[in-house]
Amino acid sequence: NELVAIARILERVIPAEMDGETCVREMRAAGDSNWKQVQWQGFYFEMIARRELNKQIGGTRQRLFNTDFDYVRNFVWDMKAHSSENERGQATNECILNDARATEKAIEDSGLGFIILTGKPLYDMEFTRWHKAFRGGGTDEPGRKLKKSFTPEALEIFFVKDRTELESAVSSGALKILSQGKNSNGKPR
């Protein structure tokens, strides 16, 4: 079972704590194009997960419309790192997933799995300044704090096999369709 194999591999590779500076430096050294991203914890999770999954069971990535899905073997999988609380220490229960059209297409084609790593973030302005300088973002004061660290609390894997399961998840409130944004050229996603 692909889901079980993914879970076993990821349980072994996810670190007990993700330090922002260490992870960003590792991503840069590995040539990962997302090392400058402010949501480094999600891109770091994707990088280490894909690397280990590809090494142990093979796989690739897939692009549907304008959306990249993180891992594909027999099924399409999307990975997310979700913070269990915001900067004010309030619990955050919603995790934003991918574009609705691409999600529906992936479900139609093969089914779609969501791999969600939930963790407790530590927000820190000193790290934010370091990150901005490291990525070459100028010297003006950053507007909001970034996550200095991310401590994994739970790995959850969900699989939606078809449109019927998607509709059931939406009607039960397990999934919610948000208003869809626009691309940089102003056209709908």
Feature roles, as predicted:
Residues N1-T67, V72, K80-R189:
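Nucleic-acid endonuclease domains
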